[in-house]
Amino acid sequence: MTRVIVTRPLREGQPWLQVLRARGWDAQALPLIELGTAPDQTSLNAAWQALQTPGRTYQALMFVSAAAVDGFWAARPATDSTSRGDGTRSIRCWATGPGTRRALLAVGIAPEQIDAPSTEAGQFDSEALWQVVSTGLRQDARVLIVRGADAMPGSVDALGGSGAGRDWLAQQLRAAQIEVDFVVSYVRALPVLDSAQCALARQAATDGSVWLFSSSQALQNLQRILPGQDWSMARAVASHPRIERAAKSAGFGAVKLARPVLDELMASIESLA
């Protein structure tokens, strides 16, 4: 049985582990990104306050990932925990992909409030999201981009080099005369792997395991954890062209591109198994 290495942060990776195991794969968790609490809670509190202040609120909140949603709602004022008097009832919520959309639904955002690329979109990224939202914006609008921050300088996030996805979207918004604010709702850090996890990673570099990557930073962290490891016999499935390029640059011998939807991931895994 081919082993599949799920590299997503532990909480985000659990659904994939369950599905893969149900389909008969030997799926193993090897989280290559550690998620933590945002260091500046003051900025998060200010963002929530703006949502409750007439004349200061946003037309849309853009979330770069499911972790961004979770971190943002973790800072929600306790007095609004049941009333939805938090200013989000009428604001559009933008998601780049299905995982982020599910996270928004889980915190109580109504499906009709969410803008996201369709499940048939060629990619789930900022460019695809822009095609959905660009025609419905007011020129005097404000958009808040809720993102993560890297604990280590120079890291690459799931949207591309140095936050390329969110920076590209912010440029499009500003060119359309839209005011853009940012707030950090979580941090991404290098995980500390134990000896068994390091042994699993080394073995999976040569034994035919299939690695699943949904973040370029996960690849960077893997290279930091195992410097000098030869990946020429390793096989991987990447969820975005930027991540595909990063895997090839890291030396992975075989890399398949697949959107992060179940049927495509399964087909790519099977083609490498």
Q: How should each PLM-predicted stretch be described?
A:
Residues 1-273:
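Conserved beta-alpha
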